[in-house]
Amino acid sequence: MIDVNKLRGRMAEKRRSGQDMAKVIGKTPKTFYAKMKACVFDSDEIEAMVKDLEIENPIEIFFADEVTR
């Protein structure tokens, strides 16, 4: 499950908005926020976000033991 707080934190560190991330994964901002709320991203979307946000350990964010919303 996705640790949304860590994802949002990394987005803030890299100064990326939801709209920016929507472009990165090729979706509308509405779809991006819906996917984040539902904690559902496909592997291509995760890969794109990891690359754009320069995430060193994606497991901590995208495969967290506890889900945060």
Task: Describe the residue ranges of each PLM region.
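DNA major-groove recognition helix of helix-turn-helix/homeodomain DNA-binding modules
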Residues: D44-E60
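Residues within the helices of the helix-turn-helix
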Residues: R8, Q19, E47
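Residue-level signal for the short linker/turn that defines the boundary of a DNA-recognition helix
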Residues: R15-R16, D44
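Recognition helix of helix-turn-helix/homeodomain-like DNA-binding domains
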Residues: G26-F41
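Short, charged recognition helix plus adjacent turn
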Residues: G9-R15, K23, A34, I59-R69
